[in-house]
UniProtKB/Swiss-Prot annotation:
<feature type="binding site">
    <location>
        <begin position="89"/>
        <end position="91"/>
    </location>
    <ligand>
        <name>ATP</name>
    </ligand>
</feature>
<comment type="pathway">
    <text>Cofactor biosynthesis; coenzyme A biosynthesis; CoA from (R)-pantothenate: step 4/5.</text>
</comment>
<keyword id="KW-0963">Cytoplasm</keyword>
<dbReference type="GO" id="GO:0005524">
    <property type="term" value="F:ATP binding"/>
</dbReference>
<feature type="binding site">
    <location>
        <position position="88"/>
    </location>
    <ligand>
        <name>substrate</name>
    </ligand>
</feature>
<keyword id="KW-0067">ATP-binding</keyword>
<comment type="similarity">
    <text>Belongs to the bacterial CoaD family.</text>
</comment>
<keyword id="KW-0808">Transferase</keyword>
<comment type="function">
    <text>Reversibly transfers an adenylyl group from ATP to 4'-phosphopantetheine, yielding dephospho-CoA (dPCoA) and pyrophosphate.</text>
</comment>
<dbReference type="Pfam" id="PF01467">
    <property type="entry name" value="CTP_transf_like"/>
</dbReference>
<dbReference type="InterPro" id="IPR004821">
    <property type="entry name" value="Cyt_trans-like"/>
</dbReference>
<dbReference type="GO" id="GO:0004595">
    <property type="term" value="F:pantetheine-phosphate adenylyltransferase activity"/>
</dbReference>
<feature type="binding site">
    <location>
        <position position="18"/>
    </location>
    <ligand>
        <name>ATP</name>
    </ligand>
</feature>
<comment type="subunit">
    <text>Homohexamer.</text>
</comment>
<feature type="binding site">
    <location>
        <begin position="124"/>
        <end position="130"/>
    </location>
    <ligand>
        <name>ATP</name>
    </ligand>
</feature>
<feature type="binding site">
    <location>
        <begin position="10"/>
        <end position="11"/>
    </location>
    <ligand>
        <name>ATP</name>
    </ligand>
</feature>
<keyword id="KW-0547">Nucleotide-binding</keyword>
Length: 160
């Protein structure tokens, strides 16, 4: 088990579904880099630094997990990190087509980067950052979907 893997995403915010996949990846690979994407086309609720801190909190118990922000092409970030595996999550069959296209594009850009797909536990399969933000925006309790520190941070954001 000498493989370095990257699990990329926006993580705005990190959910229990993300945490589930991170824990699964940490068992499979020697080192897992959580790559938090800075995507100019998205308007995240949390800054990159806030997302990094929240993910560090959620993954603090995992010795082989590192959290890093990045911008630019994922395949370039993977090369920088000397990663040979790209971890992606599939919540539903509907995710597969898009992920399949991404995997093929990444393979064309970087033939040595292999995509591995993981599925979350059933109780986390419906959770998305978008849904969590929507519930929080309307004053709902999101503590069953995210780490308590993430729930508190979301509540503070919503209160202004």
């Amino acid at each position: 088990m000498h493989t370095r893997a990257i699990y990329p995403g926006t993580f705005d915010p990190v959910t229990n579904g993300h945490a589930d996949l991170i824990e699964r990846a940490a068992k499979l690979f020697k080192h897992v880099v959580i790559g938090i994407a800075l995507n100019p086309s998205k308007k995240p609720r949390f800054t990159l630094d806030e997302r990094i801190e929240l993910l560090k909190t959620v993954t603090a118990h995992l010795d082989n997990v590192e959290v890093v922000g990045f911008s630019g092409l994922l395949v370039d970030f993977a090369k920088e990190q000397q990663a040979s595996v790209l971890v992606r999550g599939l919540r539903a069959v509907s995710d597969f087509e898009y992920e399949f296209q991404l995997a093929n594009m990444n393979r064309r850009l970087s033939p040595d980067l292999e995509s591995v797909f993981l599925t979350p536990a059933e109780e986390n399969s419906f959770i998305s950052s978008t849904l969590v933000k929507e519930v929080a925006h309307h004053g709902g309790d999101v503590s069953q979907f995210v780490h308590i520190k993430v729930a508190n941070a979301l509540m503070k954001k919503e209160q202004g």
